[in-house]
Amino acid sequence: MSPHPPAQSRTQSRTQAAPFAIANVRRVGIVGRYNTPGIAQPLKRLAAFLVGRGIDVLVEADTSSLIRLRSYPAATIDELGTLADLVIVVGGDGTMLSVSRQLAMHGIPLIGINQGRLGFLTDIGLAEMETALAAVFDGRLTVEDRMLLRADVIRGDQTVTSSLAFNDVVVNRGGFGGMVDLSVAIGSSYVCDLRCDGVIIATPTGSTAYSMSAHGPIVHPSVRAWSLVPISPHALTNRPIVVGDSERVTITVTRAREAAIHWDGQTQQGLVEGDCVVIEAAPCSVRLVHPEGYDYYAMLRKKLHWSESPLSMDRSSRRTESRTPRNKQERKSDGQKAA
């Protein structure tokens, strides 16, 4: 008997997030990318803003310890999941991915403040942090639920690893230089054999990440589907396909000297020949809160520099580079200023 229930029954059993009311938020958790130079001051600004709104503040334990935000109670990520009504993440998309996965089962809404580079998920800039958050707490906001994937590694008749992914699940050749042979099935249908560097299974959120670099489609977050994108396939006719989220994708490693699976590029597991990776929609989702007026297409246009001439894009890139510390001494100086 298969260790997994039919895909349809799993889809029907997904939890439905309760309606979110900002007026009910009494306690907010703060998580920061604490190893980033200069992040201490924005975190202190954020905490002061929340206290000024009459909101209790909890600071994630590692953030509290390393940034010395000891004026506020500290809590682990799991504790934030049970104690906080809302969590604000200050960092880049990588930080947001990690926090989202850890809090997904708790159903805690998240707001992202961008202290990184692109900021697809952390869409509020530091310069407008207080203004944007004031609008949110005044009720001028947009809420959206983003899907997650769950990927299980089956070896023989045992599930050896299971984890969630917000962006993507990647099965690839690991550290070995040769290709890997994979067999792909969707539901009960055999699809194809692939000889390639790997394959990306991307959520709509992840469609603007690794998948886009591998020529996968950009999928709007409201579309209940994910993309299956081959990485450098040997046969040029192997193309990306979009799969409905009620399906189950099974990828079997049929031949490989070395192979691995990666969840959001942050956790991984080695694979051997015969291993099956079973991917399906997770029973939980990530709830993102944006200021009113958030526009996905405007975000794409801004982040991906659509409608800009090549010359203006080059100038923008040069300005970004000029603001980036170019050596250890400059980074050290930034850290001293932040302290």
Locations of the language-model features?
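A residue-level signal for conserved active-site and pocket-lining positions in enzyme catalytic cores
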Residues: R33, I88, G92, N114, ...
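Short glycine/serine/threonine-rich phosphate/pyrophosphate-binding segments
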Residues: I39-A40, G94-S100, T208-S213
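Short glycine-rich anion-binding loops that position phosphate/pyrophosphate groups of nucleotides
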Residues: N35, D93-T95, L118, T205-S207
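ATP/NTP phosphate-donor binding region
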Residues: M1-L86, V90, A127-T142, V153-S163
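Gly/Ser/Thr-rich active-site loops/lids in small-molecule metabolic enzymes
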Residues: S189-T237
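ATP/nucleoside-binding phosphotransfer catalytic cores, i.e., glycine-rich phosphate-binding loops
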Residues: V171, G187-Y190, L236-A339
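Gly/Ser-rich helix-loop-strand patches that form or flank binding pockets
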Residues: L103-I113, F120
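Catalytic core of DAGKc-family lipid kinases
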Residues: L118-D197
